[in-house]
Amino acid sequence: MCGIIGYSGPRPAAEVLLKGLERLEYRGYDSAGIAVVTDKAYIESVKKSGKLNVLKTCLERRTTPIVGSTGIGHTRWATHGEPSDRNAHPHMDTEQSLAIVHNGIIENSDVLKRELLASGKSFTSETDTEVVAHLLSDAFKKTQDLVQAFVEVTQRLEGAFAVVAIHKDQPNTIVAAKNNSPLLLGFGQGENFLASDIAAFAEYTQRVANIDQERIVALSGDSVYITDFAGHPVDYEVHTVSWHPASVDSSGWSSFMLKEIFEEPQAVENTLKGRTEDGTVILPECDHIRDDLLAIDRVVLVGCGTAAYAAMTASYSIEAWAGLPVSVELSHEFRYREPVLNSKTLAVFISQSGETMDSLMAVRYARQAGVKTISVCNVMDSSIPKESHAVIYTKAGPEVAVASTKSFVCQIVVLYLLALYLGQLRGFRSIFPRQKAVCELNRLPVKLKQVLEIYESVRQLAHWMSDSRSILFLGRHAGYPIALEAALKLKELAYIHAEGFAAGELKHGPIALIEPGQPVFVIVPSPVGSPILHAKVISNIREIKSRGARIIAIAAEGDSAVLPHADSVLRIPLTRYSFEPLLSIVPLQIFALELAADKGFDVDRPRNLAKSVTVE
């Protein structure tokens, strides 16, 4: 489910493939491998379970290097079969004539495997990928052409997949098939690339072409040819992207995640740039659906994990600033519960990668129901934006750490902009004047920088609490989803029990978890912006403090009411309470990172997690 790289050109393929796999490590993986058509026209493949360094060491210990200029590589995240050498990619046919790598899931692999076993084929792995290797091998024997073999085999495959293959009898050619799984082309001088992510070949070229769904691609060092699944030639468009390899370099930082947290002020500034003017919001991305937006009577926000919590956070402001009812849905549940949708519904889909399979399927479901769709994504020209009526890009820049930080903050900012934009269109007059909201929104980059000044205090707190086995997070209003996100970050990175609760729910059950010494982070709304909410949260703090909880408060500067009740206070700048979540999450992100680092865990690549979840 993770990373693919293919290369054909004059360079040593093994070196290019390994560099590409290094750039794809951030997506998460449990094994890695490469296959190269050698100068002697046979395929040599090496694959190992574990980190990429294990594969590198294996290659370095070889008495003879792998020599060849066309090859494929893969980082695997197990979906069929345990992480092991035999289940790692690439997979080969019985004759060792063909090698393939594959992302996605072949949903009818069990049926196909039974057919192949009945025909006398044997299998060396537990994967669905090996099924495709045998099918392609048989088809090639009939057609003697790898493209035609793919045309035949893709008719039999069900599910979402990107399959990339090389064959010893077509030594300078790579052929791939794409169906609902990320894959794009890179064009160099006398060399071409194929990858699931531009990061894999960014140091060689920024000229790319996105491959549409249900396409077969054949490439060599000097040519690219694309057909549909029926074998009919189709056109493609090459464009240049702005991507510098330094953007995926963590030099000078202990981790990509820490680097990305400190990039949040600039990321928010970039996301806001050109989108506000004189107290109004400008979203030209939505101008072509303006009339449709005027007709909507409700909004549905859809996402998974961190993106869902960004949606929850912003839902309060959309209702307050646009006067529209809002519901928040998990992408993987959305299309299975028969939601009531119509042409007056606006569905907004949030995904950092733009490739989250659950969200992509939800977009298609919504469009079939006649719903207007907007996507909020970070990766340009990814699948979800292509299938949405409109897209508003976050401009967070590349995010390498698996756990999202700056993308989360920028997603909320974009949803705030959308809330204000919808309010403008509808002429809705909220309690908080729109011009003031826009002004305060533009102050956020400076205030985020101020929050980062407490980094050392948060780091020390994490060190003191590194032996904690369970940590709770409480919040009210838009602070509640921030509590959920903070708990998720701690689970993702530090592998300890963490739960987020709405503070008002304490007395309805969760207070039973409170015992002497129990750490509880409480997100305290400012008394200036919301004195009623503030008083309620202080009451909640007193309630759990009386039962021995250790209280760590996230509170605005000048809020003295928390001091008698909190064991520690982490201060954030004063802002309108609608914007407090954007500031409150930052110390909580740092805390999760530093606590995990103190335990010796890899904060950039947590176990079992993938950056882009491209299977259902």
Swiss-Prot record:
Domain SIS: 289-428, 461-606
PROSITE patterns: GATASE_TYPE_2, SIS
Catalytically driven reaction(s): D-fructose 6-phosphate + L-glutamine = D-glucosamine 6-phosphate + L-glutamate
Kinase found in the keyword field: no
EC number: 2.6.1.16
GO BP annotations listed: carbohydrate metabolic process; fructose 6-phosphate metabolic process; protein N-linked glycosylation; UDP-N-acetylglucosamine metabolic process
Taxonomy, superkingdom: Bacteria
Domain Glutamine amidotransferase type-2: 2-222
GO cellular component, one term: cytosol
This protein's record includes keyword Metal-binding: no
Disordered: annotated segments: 70-89
Function noted in UniProt: Catalyzes the first step in hexosamine metabolism, converting fructose-6P into glucosamine-6P using glutamine as a nitrogen source.
Self-association and partners: Homodimer.
Pfam families assigned to the protein according to its UniProt record, in alphabetical order: GATase_6 (PF13522), SIS (PF01380)
Active site: 2 (nucleophile), 611 (for fru-6p isomerization activity)
Keywords, in A-Z order: Aminotransferase, Cytoplasm, Glutamine amidotransferase, Repeat, Transferase
Protein localization: Cytoplasm
Stated name of the protein: Glutamine--fructose-6-phosphate aminotransferase [isomerizing]
CDD domains: GFAT, SIS_GlmS_GlmD_1, SIS_GlmS_GlmD_2
GO terms assigned for molecular function: carbohydrate derivative binding; glutamine-fructose-6-phosphate transaminase (isomerizing) activity
